Amino acid sequence: MRLDKFLKETRIIKRRTIAQQLAKNGKIIRNNIALKPASEIRSGDELELFLRSRFLKIRVLSEKEYEVIEEKKIWGG
């Protein structure tokens, strides 16, 4: 499944266009590599997301499920 679609379907991010912008700006990382919006996501992947006011590290369980590994509030968005 595409990264932007996964983030929208799981409701981590409300709009697919916002997910695309985050990816284009290098705010979504897997294995120390910034992902593109069309990057394929598979179960077992660990993603790091730098959102406006928080850092989120998740593990993909399926196309519609994930588990939060780490979550931190950050300032300066």
Please provide the spans of the model-predicted regions.
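Strongly charged
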Residues: R2-K5, E9, R16-G77
